[in-house]
Design a protein with these regions (language model features):
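Glycine-rich, aromatic-lined ligand/substrate-binding cores of catalytic
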Residues: 292-308, 332
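Local cysteine-cluster metal-coordination motifs and their immediate loop/turn environment
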Residues: 96-106, 337
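Flexible glycine/acidic-rich beta-alpha junction loops that bind and position SAM and/or redox cofactors
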Residues: 208-212, 270-290, 308-318
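Alpha-helix C-terminal capping/helix-coil junction sites
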Residues: 58-59, 233, 299
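Conserved glycine-rich "GG(E/T)P / GGGxP" loop and the immediately following alpha-helix
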Residues: 90, 94, 107-277
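Accessory C-terminal segments flanking Radical SAM cores
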Residues: 3-35, 306-338
Length: 338
């Protein structure tokens, strides 16, 4: 046996946190016992300690077989993660948006996907779904605000893709990133009919702070968006909302308890909460402890978290843009990886 090259150790309040970077296995031991652990990992073949210790470390991947090439294993894991029978296509119907959030990186170019490009996207979808190596097709909507052109772009393209997938016997579903303002009852019905079961919607803090940042020419949007989120969840038990909270120090200090307490209990399991710091404040403001308190409380209320408070590591691809079977088509016909 030999020691894994991906064993890491960190001191923490009289304990040593031990992590294996390949498996994500982690445990803590006292500082007094750490020299013994280091000796075992340095000389694993001496077998001078209890055999159960060696077996436990082997099971946790801290000790590995002599002929195991960990780098080769990681390469294979990555290759397996970017391949597959799923094709993910993101379409941006427009770069326009009805909001003007101060931190937004988009350029809000006016214009929508024209009919010529729309028909070419349909042909592309037909070609992808017909491939024998593709079993599943995910159509995802982004922008700008995609629902600005629901009737012109989303409705015909989604119906076309769904029909083609059903004809070919392939799995089909949709996802969307939207500000949620135009997620009306009619569109929610459409979502149910076309398997659009997951949406990401953002709140920028409590009602006051959100309306200060996310408004339609001064008109508040908080109550309308929150109502749309609840209606979307209630329309289909399979529906999921990734509720992104763009936060700054001001958002955290102002508190969010009232926001999460106001959402009915029965839909909370369908709402996955994802806190993301506004990128212009990264490294400037410190909110770690207060953020952890929010996460713990929100979890107690029955919401699943995207920001899991448990430790985890990436295994395989870092992002869907790493996938081989993926593309992003912009409203003007340009195709991007990211």
């Amino acid at each position: 046996m030999k020691s894994s090259r991906y064993n890491y150790f960190a001191a923490d309040d009289g304990k040593i946190i031990c992590l294996n970077g390949v498996t994500g296995n982690v445990f803590a031991i006292s500082e007094d016992v750490f020299p013994l652990l280091k000796d075992i990992l340095k000389n694993p073949n001496d077998q001078i300690y209890d055999a159960n210790l060696y077996q436990s470390l082997y099971n946790l991947h801290f000790l590995i077989d002599d002929d195991l090439d960990e780098i080769d294993c990681l390469r294979k894991r990555y290759q397996d993660s970017i391949k597959g029978s799923l094709y993910k296509l993101i379409v941006n119907p427009t770069q326009e948006c009805n909001f003007r959030c101060w931190y937004c990186y988009e350029n809000h170019v006016k214009g929508q996907m024209n009919n010529n490009i729309l028909e070419r996207v349909k042909l592309f979808i037909d070609k992808i779904i017909a491939r024998t190596d593709i079993n599943s097709f995910e159509l995802s909507w982004f922008g700008g605000e995609p629902l600005l052109y629901f009737k012109e772009i989303i409705y015909p393209l989604a119906r076309h893709a769904q029909c083609k997938a059903e004809k070919e016997g392939k799995s089909f579903w949709q996802t969307m990133t939207t500000n949620g303002y135009y997620l009306t009852p009619d569109i929610i019905t459409f979502c149910k009919e076309t398997r659009l079961t997951s949406v990401q919607i953002t709140l920028d803090g409590n009602r006051e702070l959100h309306n200060r940042t996310r408004n339609e020419q001064g008109k508040p949007s908080f109550d309308r968006i929150l109502e749309n989120i609840i209606n979307f969840c209630r329309s289909n038990i399979e529906n999921e909302v990734i509720l992104r909270i763009n936060y700054t120090k001001e958002v955290i200090e102002a508190g969010l308890k009232e926001v999460f307490e106001s959402i009915p209990d029965e839909v909370r399991p369908q709402i996955r909460v994802n806190f993301q710091r506004v990128w212009q404040t990264v490294g400037i403001e410190k909110t770690s402890e207060a953020l952890m308190e929010h996460l713990k409380y929100i979890k107690e209320l029955g919401y699943p978290l995207v920001n899991n408070t448990a430790f985890d590591i990436y295994r395989g691809k870092q992002c869907y843009a790493d996938m081989l079977n993926y593309a992003n088509i912009n409203y003007d016909g340009n195709v991007f990886r990211c």
